[in-house]
């Protein structure tokens, strides 16, 4: 029964391929100009990269290195002591 269901779902998934138009149908709402889309993505990515490098080198986002270390207690009490854990 499981094999029949799987085969039926595969046939249903493949049915739209039979009615699909070729990729040259420029009037289709699902036609994309992939070259322009890729070029726009590369330009956008390059601008983001340049902006990130400029922000990192500008010194506006400084990590403050002169923090005073937090005072920790000298002796830390363990949460689980030997023999306190039950199995």
Swiss-Prot record:
Q: Where in the cell is it found?
A: Cell membrane; Basolateral cell membrane
Q: Which residues cross the membrane?
A: 36-57
**What role does it play?**
Associates with and regulates the activity of the sodium/potassium-transporting ATPase (NKA) which catalyzes the hydrolysis of ATP coupled with the exchange of Na(+) and K(+) ions across the plasma membrane. Increases the apparent affinity of the transporter for Na(+) and increases NKA activity.
**Gene Ontology terms: cellular component:** basolateral plasma membrane; sodium:potassium-exchanging ATPase complex
Expressed, tissue-wise, as follows:
Selectively present in the distal parts of the nephron (medullary and papillary collecting ducts and end portions of cortical collecting tubule) and in the epithelial cells of the distal colon. No expression is found in renal proximal tubule, loop of henle and distal tubule, proximal colon, small intestine, lung, choroid plexus, salivary glands, or brain.
Species of the source: Rattus norvegicus
Q: Which UniProt keywords apply?
A: Cell membrane, Ion transport, Membrane, Potassium, Potassium transport, Signal, Sodium, Sodium transport, Sodium/potassium transport, Transmembrane, Transmembrane helix, Transport
**Ranges per topology, Extracellular:** 21-35
Where does the signal sequence lie? 1-20
State what protein this is by name.
FXYD domain-containing ion transport regulator 4
Q: Give the protein family.
A: Belongs to the FXYD family.
Q: Care to name a GO molecular-function term for this sequence?
A: potassium channel activity
Please give the CDD domains that the UniProt record associates with this protein.
FXYD4
Induction (record text): By corticosteroids.
Q: What is the lineage of its organism?
A: Eukaryota, Metazoa, Chordata, Craniata, Vertebrata
Q: Which terms does the UniProt entry file under GO BP? A: inorganic cation transmembrane transport; positive regulation of sodium ion export across plasma membrane; sodium ion transport
Q: How does it assemble?
A: Regulatory subunit of the sodium/potassium-transporting ATPase which is composed of a catalytic alpha subunit, a non-catalytic beta subunit and a regulatory subunit. The regulatory subunit, a member of the FXYD protein family, modulates the enzymatic activity in a tissue- and isoform-specific way by changing affinities of the Na+/K+-ATPase toward Na(+), K(+) or ATP.
Membrane topology listed for this record: Single-pass type I membrane protein
Give the region (Disordered) as residue ranges. Answer: 67-87
Mapped to this chain, the residue ranges on the Cytoplasmic side of the membrane are 58-87
Pfam families cross-referenced by the UniProt entry: ATP1G1_PLM_MAT8
């Amino acid at each position: 029964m499981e094999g029949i269901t799987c085969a039926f779902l595969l046939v249903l998934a493949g049915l739209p391929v039979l009615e699909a138009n070729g990729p040259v149908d420029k009037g289709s709402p699902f036609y994309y100009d992939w070259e322009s889309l890729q070029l726009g993505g590369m330009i956008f990515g390059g601008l983001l990269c340049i902006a990130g490098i400029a922000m990192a080198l500008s010194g506006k986002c400084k990590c403050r290195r002169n923090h005073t270390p937090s005072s920790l207690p000298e002796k830390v009490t363990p949460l689980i002591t030997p023999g306190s854990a039950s199995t």
